[in-house]
Design a protein with these regions (language model features):
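C-terminal domain-tail junction helix/linker
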Residues: 57, 192-236
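Short, small-residue-biased leader/transition segments that mark boundaries at the very start
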Residues: 1-6
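Mobile genetic element proteins and their domesticated derivatives, centered on retroelements
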Residues: 45-47, 86, 111, 130, ...
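Extended, low-complexity cationic-aromatic segments
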Residues: 26-112, 224
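RNase H-like polynucleotidyl transferase catalytic core
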Residues: 69-75, 148-170, 186-189
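Active-site proximal helix-loop segment of RNase H-like, two-metal nucleases, encompassing DDE(D)
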Residues: 94, 163, 171-190, 203-207
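Acidic/histidine-rich, metal-coordinating catalytic segments
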Residues: 122-136, 162
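Short, basic/hydrophobic alpha-helical segments
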Residues: 105-126
């Protein structure tokens, strides 16, 4: 029977049991999101996603009066690339870029761009991101001299989301919005993808699209109460 072959699987967006490490990282990030807007200490969220470049196996039939464009279900895989995204939730600043790979070197170069181009004059950049293996200070030292890597690091205050819990990274929301608005069709090469995302970035920055994050520590302590360690107080 099919039920004997296909076993039901469960996937959790949050831990299924008490998890102090998750709680500690989550509350740290939520505290950052509650900080008031300070242009000298901007809170910036960063995330990245792979993207599959797809070409057409056959030329689409163009739109005609009364008929939509017709696209063949068959497509051609043209390799993959990586999309990096930065968003400042309270300031409304946005940046997306496309790279052929997602190595430590790529991340380091993106962080240098964040520090030297996006925010060259601020006191400190408060950076929220997931703890992917390349999202580490060591990556800067792999790309730049020790002096340069240290200079960039001193510009940053890093906060990591809990492991496997990237829903706490506002930049993931940004990538989801971008996917719905800009990537709902086949794009066959990096050059075209960069043009599409550049236009999308300009639009997002023109309207200074902000993010109103509502989930706070006090909410977490109620809704996720089962994940918090419990303590028994001895009676006197």
């Amino acid at each position: 029977a099919a039920s004997d072959v296909y076993k039901r699987q469960e996937y959790w967006c949050i831990p299924s049991r008490e998890d102090a490490e998750f709680i500690a990282c989550m509350e740290d990030v939520l505290d950052v999101y509650e900080l008031p807007y300070n242009p000298q200490r901007p809170v910036v969220c960063m995330d990245e996603k792979p993207y599959q470049l797809l070409g057409e196996a056959r030329s689409p039939l163009p739109m005609r009066p009364g008929n939509d464009q017709k696209v063949d279900s068959e497509y051609v895989r043209n390799g993959t690339c990586s999309i990096f995204a930065f968003v400042e939730p309270l300031g409304g600043a946005h940046h997306v870029s496309v790279r052929e790979h997602r190595t430590a070197i790529d991340w380091a170069e993106e962080i240098k761009y964040l520090a030297d181009v996006m925010y060259p004059d601020v006191e400190k950049i408060i950076l929220v991101m997931d703890n992917l293996n390349t999202h580490k200070p060591a990556s800067l030292y792999k790309r730049y001299t020790a002096d340069e890597a240290r200079r960039i690091m001193k510009r940053l205050e890093i906060h990591y989301t809990p492991k496997h819990e990237s829903w706490l990274d506002i930049a993931e929301i940004e990538l989801n919005v971008m996917t719905r608005q800009c990537l709902n069709r086949r794009i066959d090469n990096i050059s075209n993808l960069r043009k599409e995302l550049s236009a999308w970035e300009v639009e997002r920055n023109t309207v200074a699209a902000k993010v109103n994050w509502q989930f706070r520590t006090e909410d977490a302590r109620i809704k996720l109460n089962s994940l918090y360690p419990t303590f028994t107080t001895a009676s006197e």
